[in-house]
Amino acid sequence: MSLLILVRHGQSVWNLENRFTGWVDVDITQKGEEEAKKAGNLLLKEKLNIDYYFASFQLRAKRTLSIIKEILNDNKEIQEFWELNERHYGALTGLNKDEMKAKLGEQKVHEFRRSWNLRPDKLDQNNSHHPRNLDIYKNIPKDLIPDTESLEDTYNRVIKIYDKHIRQLVKKNNVLISAHGNSIRALCKFLFKLDENQISKLEIPTGNPLYIRFDNNEDISECRYLDNERAKDLVVF
């Protein structure tokens, strides 16, 4: 048997400000640090031995994972993949969600956030928030850097990297992935065979480890959030 632990980063600065963040590299807040510490202590209480750690390229995911590893007193290397990044919100990047609801209507903003294949307008490549203009992405081929993404686009890149680098490890090891709301939703769609309607309802809380145990046939035998007080509904389980 093996384990996969999925952790959405602790609250970020732009989570607090209610802004569309996407690929912008913001840090976590004080509350986010506390969430990461609690996640680490919950994992410590489970007495788990994590064999492999993965994170996106983004600071909020890496900082969350570093705090968790410090609490676990584990010095194993973190493997970073940009494909685990948050969904790119295109021209919505940096905008306040409530202001967009007032401007476009709540239903339209909900569609942008939750629909499967709807992409927001592209983010201008001259915009300071565009990934092409951020140092952390300078080694990614420019033709692979998106201007906008749907959840389907996010799913495709996340599952491609999961299949290539992580899936085989999960068969016989305990793996922890620190990522983002939409990249974790993509993984949940794949692992739990969710349809497009189910994935639109799935909420991923910040800083709460999702514990997934597999049997020897790679079937899920157990799934739960470690922090019951902050658990969201697991619509599929």
Feature names for model-found ranges:
Residues 4, 62, 70, 145, ...:
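Active-site-adjacent alpha-helix immediately C-terminal to a catalytic or transition-state-stabilizing loop
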Residues 2-11:
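Short coil-to-beta-strand
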Residues 229-237:
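Short, cationic low-complexity segments
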Residues 217-230:
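Short, well-ordered strand-loop elements centered on a beta-strand within folded domains, enriched
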Residues 1, 50, 75, 172-174:
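A general structural motif
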Residues 10, 55-58, 83, 114, ...:
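Short, well-ordered beta-to-alpha junction loops that form the rim of enzyme active sites
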Residues 40-131, 137, 189-213, 236-237:
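Phosphate-coordination/substrate-recognition cap region in phosphate-metabolizing enzymes
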Residues 11-69, 79, 144-160, 201:
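Loop-to-helix element that buttresses phosphate recognition and phosphoryl-transfer chemistry
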